[in-house]
Amino acid sequence: MTAIARNIGAGLAGLLLVGAADAQTATEVWRTTGFSSPESVEWDAAAGLFYVSNMGADPMAKDGDGYIATMGADGAIRTDKWVTGLDAPKGMAIQGGKLFTADIDQLVEIDIASGQISNQYPAAGSVLLNDVIAAPDGRVFVSDTFGNSVWVLEAGVMAIFAQDPMLMGANGLSLAGNSLIVANLGDASQGFDKIKPGYVVALDLTSRAITAYGSADPSGVLDGVEPDGVGGVLITDNMGGRLLQQAPGGAAVEVGKLEPGAADLEFVADQGLIVVPLTPSNTVVGLSWGR
């Protein structure tokens, strides 16, 4: 999920991506506007399209103006408001013909075939549900950014899976083997103007032990995290407007300049395409990830 858009400020005017000489670099190939605080993108390989969550006017308000759009791999919007009636949907994941999205204090299940909401799973006591990832065993994990925790949907019930200071500002989620990779926003308890940047951790799904994924030095106000296709991860630094890459055990390296408000990215490896919502400018960009 994005670091709350209203606390980030205006986006930069352009997008310039420059990587280190020995690193892969990303190049913008398309840019699509017309969204309403887009927060996350999810690729549906079977349908050949992206789902784009739109938070609407207020990312914390239960105001019913949130929705999900669909978009092609070329950046063209297919359906502006495919699913409506949401509040402020953020991260998404697909499992068993359903699209799951985090919507403030509940996980919403959408039937992909019909485009209708098919279930809602409240997370009583959660503060701000954020990103979502579906595990092969059927469990669905959800980060709670301001609750410093990860929740799990299992047997139709939401419960806290892990809560720990090492999950400070738990945001983006990804899977690597038996570990949940968590990109931490950082400590925003004193307000966003005094935020202490976070770093990436690994949460063992069996023991629930939490360790640093690589360097524990602050990497940024982290948002989305995705496998990079070469054994590491790609990360967005929301406030810094940066695209980062990190290998297990290593430090996060800047591989591209984005805009402040860069949110929950998606990487489609077989297309070499990174897609990033730029929340404040109501824009989604597609980037070619050179190999």
Model-derived features: positions:
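Bacterial N-terminal signal peptides that target proteins for export
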Residues: 1-10
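Glycine/small-residue-rich hydrophobic helix-like segments
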Residues: 195-254
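Beta-rich, blade/repeat-based domains predominating
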Residues: 35-47, 58, 64-65, 83-100, ...
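A short loop-to-beta-strand structural motif that recurs across blades of beta-propeller domains
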Residues: 60, 64-69, 106-108, 149-152, ...
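Sec/Tat signal peptide C-region and signal peptidase I cleavage site
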Residues: 19-23
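Beta-propeller domains
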Residues: 52-76
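Short loop/turn segments that connect beta-strands within beta-propeller blades
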Residues: 71-75, 111-116, 153-157, 204-208, ...
